[in-house]
């Protein structure tokens, strides 16, 4: 039976984390006994970590990573690596802010044998027009830099074969801040069998997003240099339909 590692980063999510864990934990029902929910919480200054520790008594397959970088991207990388090292067959990543809907997971799971990666597509977003615009710009840049066409590169709703993630994860430094964007790009660039499926993306359920517009601009500016470096490496290796 296929094992699933459901992974999510968390940072100062005391208002959301208990509800999110309770909503997503049932996804593990019917999966291999080795399946786990893993939350990376490092750097939180509120009660997120203590709430997670309390939840572990209620949910025995819940595990906590507390020794990662506090930033979102490095946490995602650490979670992917943890799942791979512990023998996951599939990795599903989402966020801990309550914006995604667990009811939409099963449709992804049912397609798992046909694709190396199934990625959420946020056709409508509840987190504002600015973020939707940024995502469109990102997808445009990926087309320019890597000649890939993707409708949503960064959606925190993705089911991937762990063995495929393991092929590309070493290409990113442990502290890289946009791993999901590049993971989507790698899958598309190297011709992995992928599918995008529309998902619901609600407004943040509580709390404050730790990444504001100013940070987004700074991250985006740095990303241009990162994309150039990745493209140079990808062309040099001579692989993929777009090389």
What residue spans do the PLM features occupy?
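Short beta-strand-to-loop acidic/aromatic patch adjacent to the donor-nucleotide binding site
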Residues: 88-99
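A conserved acidic beta->alpha catalytic loop
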Residues: 41-50, 98
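Hydrophobic helical membrane-anchoring modules
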Residues: 1-3, 171-243
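Acceptor/aglycone-binding surface of glycosyltransferases and processive sugar-polymer synthases
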Residues: 67-82, 90, 102-177, 204-214, ...
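Short loop->beta transition adjacent to catalytic acidic/histidine clusters or analogous donor-positioning motifs
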Residues: 2-4, 25-38, 47, 60-62
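Conserved donor nucleotide-binding strand/loop of the catalytic core
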Residues: 38, 49-86
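Short, well-formed alpha-helical segments that are part of the catalytic scaffolds
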Residues: 13-28
């Amino acid at each position: 039976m296929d094992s699933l590692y459901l992974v999510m980063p968390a940072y100062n999510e005391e208002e959301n984390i208990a509800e999110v864990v309770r909503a997503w934990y049932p996804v593990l029902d019917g999966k291999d006994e080795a399946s786990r929910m893993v939350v990376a919480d490092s750097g939180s200054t509120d009660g997120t970590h203590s709430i997670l520790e309390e939840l572990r008594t209620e949910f025995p397959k819940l595990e906590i990573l507390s020794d990662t970088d506090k930033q979102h991207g490095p946490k995602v990388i650490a979670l992917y690596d943890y799942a791979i090292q512990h023998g996951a067959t599939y990795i599903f990543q989402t966020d801990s802010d309550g914006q995604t809907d667990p009811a939409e997971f099963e449709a992804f799971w049912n397609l798992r044998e046909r694709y190396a990666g199934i990625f959420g597509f946020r056709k409508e977003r509840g987190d504002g027009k600015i973020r939707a615009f940024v995502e469109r710009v990102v997808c445009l840049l990926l087309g320019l830099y890597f000649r890939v066409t993707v409708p949503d590169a960064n959606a925190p709703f993705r089911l991937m074969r762990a063995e495929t993630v393991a092929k590309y994860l070493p290409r990113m430094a442990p502290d890289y801040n946009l791993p999901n964007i590049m993971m989507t790009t790698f899958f598309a660039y190297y011709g992995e069998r992928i599918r995008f499926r529309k998902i619901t993306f609600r407004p943040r359920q509580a709390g404050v997003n730790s990444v504001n517009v100013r940070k987004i601009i700074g991250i985006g500016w740095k990303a241009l240099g990162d994309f150039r470096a990745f493209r140079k490496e990808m062309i040099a290796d001579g692989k993929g339909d777009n090389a």
